[in-house]
């Protein structure tokens, strides 16, 4: 298992060579710095402490400055521990870049969901409304919470109630990495991830067993003209049509 910190930039879409559209989220992954290594001998477990985004010393405190100097770096705005065997190969002060992952990897992305404020059960829990007519006063209220006979009026844990919606840590699992660019410092993952734009996210190897995913080849306009890319797409489509025609002839 391995992991890295980044920031959500937003969503866009890319096209594969065969013309398939894939919605992707762009994650800005600047180099992370290893600030500390936790070992079983000293701490009882193995983990790597990563720092992300520099902070001016005048905006930091002495403990944070001293901790960062052990890794020969500036104090960091965000510090996270990653419990991962593969990360133990990095030494203190080493940089962890976006090429830690590659296209075709399946990852989990953890972040803080968008805060929605105080919401009722209809919005927060998708609860049904009450009767809207015939003298009913129960339109958007919660409804029954407990019974006096069976559980003596005790409200069970997990009952849908109004309250804070969003603003909590959540994880989107099994997202495919579409592209990694270590030079520009970004990762494209398929689908959406939690949090607002510029929100901090943690990209980690998925914890669930998944099948091996074949990397997809997407159209890149860097250094080439649109006409050249369209010619490549046309050639691919022609090859697919030709192979289908051969299969049809053999079937006859």
Per-region residue spans from a language model:
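Extended basic (Lys/Arg/His-rich) segments that typically form rRNA-contacting surfaces
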Residues: 1-252
